[in-house]
Design a protein with these regions (language model features):
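Class I S-adenosyl-L-methionine
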Residues: 2-141, 149, 242
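Residues at the C-termini of beta-strands that transition into short coil/loop
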Residues: 68, 89, 142-144, 173, ...
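Short phosphate-engaging motifs
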Residues: 71, 146, 202
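A contiguous loop/helix-start segment that scaffolds small-molecule binding in enzyme catalytic cores
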Residues: 2-39, 95, 106-110, 129, ...
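Class I SAM-dependent methyltransferase SAM-binding "motif I" and its flanking Rossmann-like core
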Residues: 46, 117-190, 234-235, 284
Length: 284
């Protein structure tokens, strides 16, 4: 039977109309009508930081395909007895996709469980399109990302009035590179709240580049496995970022949060200021 589902990503890029079978469902819809595979964000690590929708998808799964190198086993254990568990740390996309397609075509509820949020460094597009090519729809369940968990653990805000109003999520170039316009030097020039994933292996060059654009005493939060039982989190001056990382032997599951906001927590937002009017609180 010919596929009736088209890749929504290709349709956008090629300016084609989307097939109704893969149109994005309204946010209020708790159960996607056409989906047979759910790509679910597991959040930063702690099971109680799952969204309710993510937890429900996992508990209802017949097949759980999960990133066992990054997702907490406690989260995978939420799946029902009898659920087929497939660990993907040693598999390629060419091995994972056919498995999901096979199970979904049998009418089973398949959950692809990713760490953090699937929309960030989650190989999402190739999975969505690969499933669509096989006539299988997808729904994506967001997850809390490491930068949010880190800011929460620090009890801090990343957007401070008069200091910084922009958050940048990126990574060091590394083996796979980044587009030239998004190199770290260009991003650092913004002096925004800069959240760096997948960068611990390159911390020396990262620090060198950042010091060209941020003061050397700019606070840097270094977070390792934030929200896991073995979480380690410390704020250090930018000039010590590499040394501390290397002392701790951090090479993976590490987030760097570089931000002037970490040093300016006393500033007040206008949102609740008596002098600030808005639609719901007009001038008195």
């Amino acid at each position: 039977m010919a596929s009736t589902v088209s890749c929504p990503i290709r349709a956008f890029v090629q300016d084609q109309p989307l097939d109704p079978a893969v149109m994005i469902q309204p946010a209020v819809s708790p159960t996607p009508v056409h989906a047979t595979v759910s790509i679910v964000g597991a959040g930063p690590g702690a099971p109680d930081l799952l969204t309710r929708r993510a937890e429900n998808r996992i508990k209802q799964a017949d097949v759980l395909v999960w990133t066992d190198s990054l997702v907490s086993p406690q989260i995978a254990a939420l799946a029902a007895d009898g659920c087929e568990s497939v660990r993907t740390s040693t598999l390629t996309l060419e091995e994972v996709l056919p498995l999901m397609i096979n199970r979904a075509q049998k009418g089973l509820k398949v959950v692809r469980l990713h760490d953090g949020d699937p929309c960030l460094y989650g190989a999402l597009s190739e999975q969505v399109c690969g499933l669509a090519d096989a006539g299988i729809g997808v729904d994506v369940v967001p997850g809390i990302s490491a930068y949010q968990a880190t800011a929460s653990a620090l009890k801090t805000e990343l957007t401070i009035p008069g200091v910084v109003q922009t958050i940048v999520l990126s990574r060091a170039g590394g083996r796979t590179g980044v587009p030239d316009a998004e190199n770290l030097a260009n991003l650092a020039r913004l002096q925004a709240s800069l959240c760096l994933y997948l960068s611990a292996r390159h911390v020396d060059e990262v620090q060198t580049t950042l010091l060209e654009h941020y003061p050397d005493d700019t606070p840097v939060a270094i977070g390792y496995r934030v929200s896991w039982p073995d979480q380690w989190l410390q704020v250090v001056p930018l000039k010590d970022m590499a040394r501390v990382s290397q002392d701790r032997k951090l090479i993976r599951t590490t987030l760097y949060l570089v931000s002037p906001a970490l040093a300016h927590q006393g500033r007040r937002s206008l949102l609740y200021s008596p002098s600030h009017d808005h639609l719901f609180r007009p001038h008195r």
